[in-house]
Amino acid sequence: MTELFRTPTAQKFNLDNYAFVFKRDDFKDLSKIVFKNSLGIFHLNKSKEQIISPWELKFPRDLPARTETIESIINSLQNLKIRKIYKRDAINISNFSLNPPLMELKLTDKEKNQMQIELGLVDSITNSTYIALKDQDIIYQIDSISFPLEKIDLSDFIETKIFSTTPKEIKAFKLFQRVGRTSKISKISIFKDKQNTWKNNRGQKFNSSSSIEVLNKFLNLKSTIILDEVTEKLEKKIERYTRSPLYSIIIQEEAGNEIEYKVSSLITSLPGIKMEKGQYFIVKASNRKFPFLVHKDSYSIFSLRESQIQRQRI
């Protein structure tokens, strides 16, 4: 038997001192994450503005990042219990698929301290995997990681939410519909008074749960495509569709900000975008860098009226 294929030998450590690979503070105050698997390399930075998410995807796209994915990655690495510890030598590095590793994570905190994590062989028989830290001369055998890191792709990192406000942060919500070329009518106009009671402009009180249910129908709206790669031709077409929108929403936040959302009618086509005719509409937000393309399945929410909240028929 050649030296390379020799059976790995576990090192004798007191595992009471090495119960877990990471300490809880290892993931505190992170500012940057670089994640690499077979599906791509993804760069994430902590967002300064935090309009829609506390994290931003910087590569391969420049978009708000999905918080749930990042939290799942971090949570999956916490509490990794060690089964065995092996010496980090050429034999073990090869046997445990750590040269190159199957997945890599580089974490940077606010003080610019870095931690580089390498993930290797996933052993389905023992339900375990192997993990190493760049600055250590040992390899850990651990229980298989619960979150499927190997399956994460670009779509998992992109935040598809359109609205950036929670019901608690809303002071007033208004929905308008265009009538004719320039006129518009108010479909919903509600506000929250100092006692946190929802009312309309006539002072009629609305049931709180019904009001929040309606707000959530809008706030949970998600995009099918984020139009972040815009040519001059595409930009002109988007402007044409949203210049006189069929619907518009104005949200006044408790913090004093006002956000406008323009919603087009169902559209026929967009230059360079593969789409079925009449199956999508555009949403353009005043506080977001890029417009959104949304499937018509969500279009029915714009037919809601203020009277439905009052009668609790949503």
Regions found by a protein language model. Name each.
Residues 1-314:
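Secondary-structure "cap/kink" motif recognition
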